[in-house]
Amino acid sequence: AVGPDVSLFKPGDEVFYAGSILRQGTNSEFHLVDERITGNKPKSLSFAQAAALPLTTITAWELLFDRLGAVPGKSVDPRTLLITGGAGGVGSILIQLARRLTGLTVAATATRPESQEWCLDLGAHAVIDHNKPMKEQIEALKVPPVALVASLTFTDQHYKAIAEFMAPQGKFGLIDDPPEFTMSAFKGKAISVHWESMFTRSSFQTADMIAQHNLLNDTADLIDKGVLRTTMDQTFGTINAAHLKRAHALLES
C-alpha cells in the first residue's frame, strides 16, 4: 500500500530500505517507510539478499562520496583509500564501491587470513594487518599517498598511528563512537575529520533525503549488472521469536 502523496512507488512494487531509528524496528511483517529513503529492490536478488544491503550500502556510499569526497566515474585518482575493518559489513561494500566506481587505490585492514582473502576477493588492491605496525606495512606497499581513510571500527585504537602516515590535507572518516578521540592528532597535517551516520537524513528530515532513494536505485542497478554483489551471510527464514533470537545472538557475537 502507498499513501496519497506517494509518487515514487505504486502498490506491488518490490522495495528495499534501512528505515528510520525514530520508530520501531523491522522485526515485523509490515513497515511504514518514507519513500525518500526507499529504493527499488534489485531484480536479481531475493528479498533476503536485498535486505542485507541498505544499512551497509547507504553508510558506505555516503562515507565514500558525501563525506570523503571521492569522485565517482574518475578512472584515475592518484590517492589511496585505507579502509580499517575491511571485511565487515560496511567495509565489504565500501571496497566494492571504491574499486568499481572510482580510480582510487584501495587498501584494507584485516587480521585473519580468511578475512584478508575476502577483502582481496572483493577487489582491494592490498590488505594489511591492523594489529601490526601499519605505517611500515603501508610504506612497504609503495602505494600512492593515503589521502582518504575510512575508519570503521576501533577508531580509538588506530587513529593516532594512522595520522602518522596520512597525507597532509587528507580526509579521515569514521562511523563508530570511539571512547577516546583527540582531534589534535590531525591538526599539524590539516586533516579534516568527517563522521558518517546514515540515519542523519531521516532523523532530521534533511532537504536532501531523496539522495538515499537515488543511491539505493543506483545500487540496485549495479547489483543487477553484476558490478556489486550482496554480502548476505545466512538467513533464518520465517519471522518468529526463535529465529529473531538466533539472529540477534549472531549480531551480538
PLM regions and their residue ranges:
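A glycine-/small-residue-rich N-terminal strand-loop-strand element
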Residues: 1-20
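Short, flexible surface segments
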Residues: 8-11, 77, 168
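Hydrophobic beta-strand signal
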Residues: 16-17, 32, 82, 173
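A structural motif shared across PLP-dependent enzymes of the aminotransferase-like
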Residues: 22-35
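Mid-domain Rossmann-like dinucleotide-binding core that forms the NAD(H)/NADP(H) cofactor-binding site
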Residues: 51-132
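Glycine-rich cofactor phosphate-binding loops and adjacent beta1-alpha1 units
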Residues: 72-75, 122, 127-196
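C-terminal hydrophobic helical "lid"/dimerization subdomain
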Residues: 206-253
